[in-house]
């Protein structure tokens, strides 16, 4: 028979664990971990080229980083997105205003708009591309020397592997908890608590690795000064999951340890 205090601790711990799992799962699947807010470009730009380069172009960290900086990009663990004007030809100019130039980034920039009506802010559309698994494991290089950047490489790999480890541990602890209920044993609860404790550390490590990786990315490719950095709500969800998992771990560990002491005392009393 289980004391009401232990049962209450198990129920509360299970609810906290479920909330943490939902928050972390949503955070992993969304792209709003980090955002860049840039002012509206007042030049004529071929947005079709930018869209094709971002969506179907060759994977290059420097290229997609420049797009994130310029076009109000958002970055997640598995997604990168930009916001471009919703038009198929030229942005902020008419066909007669074009003056084609050869730019290194394959964009065609023209002189500032000279329309009598001025440049109205166009409607924008969000374009998102997911990171493939080989891209996640790709080696990061230093921009100037083209040497492997070990720090950024392993930070990037940890930032998407750690949440998967965290979710796997929570799922495994759920299986252990079900087995404990079927066996009517309180001992596996200690293992459940340890799994949640490690999962909480992995969740915190995810946030730290991601934030450090983004900081190094901005420094490596010299983010423009007019691009404002904003922390997205997805990162906050992942950060909230850390204390929830820790509280769940504390409840499970307390329940397992207290029940063991209580059971030992009852056994000793009966023997005496």
Predicted regions and their residues:
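Juxtamembrane loop segments immediately following a transmembrane helix
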Residues: 203-236
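Residues in well-ordered beta-strands of folded domains
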Residues: 82, 163, 238
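Intrinsically disordered terminal tails
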Residues: 1-69, 93, 98-103, 107, ...
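A surface-exposed beta-alpha-beta supersecondary segment
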Residues: 34-157
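Signature of small four-pass
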Residues: 2-36, 156-213, 241, 245-255
């Amino acid at each position: 028979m289980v004391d009401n205090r232990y049962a209450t601790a198990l129920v509360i711990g299970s609810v906290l664990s479920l909330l943490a799992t939902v928050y972390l799962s949503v955070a992993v699947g969304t792209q709003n971990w980090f955002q860049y807010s840039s002012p509206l470009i007042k030049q004529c730009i071929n947005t079709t080229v930018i869209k094709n380069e971002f969506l179907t172009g060759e994977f290059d960290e420097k290229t997609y980083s420049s797009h994130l900086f310029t076009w109000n990009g958002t970055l997640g663990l598995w997604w990168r997105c930009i916001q471009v004007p919703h038009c198929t030809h030229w942005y902020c100019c008419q066909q007669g205003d074009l003056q084609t130039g050869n730019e290194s980034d394959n964009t065609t920039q023209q002189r500032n708009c000279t329309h009598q009506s001025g440049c109205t802010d166009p409607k924008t559309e969000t374009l998102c591309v997911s990171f493939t698994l080989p891209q996640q494991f790709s080696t990061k290089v230093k921009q100037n020397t083209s040497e492997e950047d070990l720090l950024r490489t392993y930070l990037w790999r940890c930032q998407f592997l750690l949440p998967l480890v965290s979710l796997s541990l929570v799922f495994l602890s759920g299986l252990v908890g079900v087995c404990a209920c079927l066996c009517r044993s309180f001992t596996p609860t200690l293992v459940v608590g340890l799994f949640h404790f490690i999962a909480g550390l992995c969740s915190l490590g995810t946030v730290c690795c991601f934030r450090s990786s983004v900081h190094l990315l901005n420094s490596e490719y010299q983010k423009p000064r007019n691009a404002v950095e904003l922390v997205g709500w997805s990162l906050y969800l992942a950060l909230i999951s850390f204390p929830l998992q820790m509280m769940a771990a504390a409840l499970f560990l307390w329940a397992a340890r207290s029940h063991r002491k209580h059971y030992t005392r009852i056994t000793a009393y009966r023997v005496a």
